[in-house]
Amino acid sequence: MSLDKKTIVEAAARIADIEGISKVNLTVIAKELGIKSPSLYKHFNGGIEELNKELMLYGWHLLECEITKAAIGKAKDDAIIAICNTYRSFVLQHKGLFEAMQWYNMYQSKEHLEATKGTVAILFQVLEAYGLTEEEKVHSVRVLRGFLQGFCSIESHNGYGNPIPLDDTFNFALKTILNGISDLKK
């Protein structure tokens, strides 16, 4: 097996999704890859801190690819619904990776800012069709991000206990947000 950064990050993502992000460390990754942990320092001389950063970047890149695919050929509400459902599915399939993606400061470096820029840009692009002002688009993106990150984070930690189906709640919240966006232009 050829050992490179991508292979190591993908192994870390698998471990995070199966065991949880707290279980990701160089020893566990080395065991998963069938190597000795000092071999990982060749690729990550910053150790686990550097690996965590790469894991965050990897997760945001994957999410951007998924929501881009979901939005293609759709407009307005249909595009936003597709993006939101894809985001939610991504989180449920990649709970550990999603957790790694949350602990970043997007203004820490240009690289961090670029990591989230694509997903945000897609939302801004879709919102163009609503004829919103720049300020209204910023507010709309913030509301959508807050809803998605909050709802999906709580759901991924099994934080909802009510017997009403979560799909119904997710769709209700999304419909409420979409109605609010549409009402901006009435």
Segments the model singles out, each with a brief description of its role:
Residues 1-3, 185-186:
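N-terminal intrinsically disordered/low-complexity leader segments
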Residues 16, 51-59, 101, 105, ...:
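Alpha-helical DNA-contacting segments of helix-turn-helix folds
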Residues 55-82, 120-129:
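Amphipathic alpha-helical linker/stalk segments
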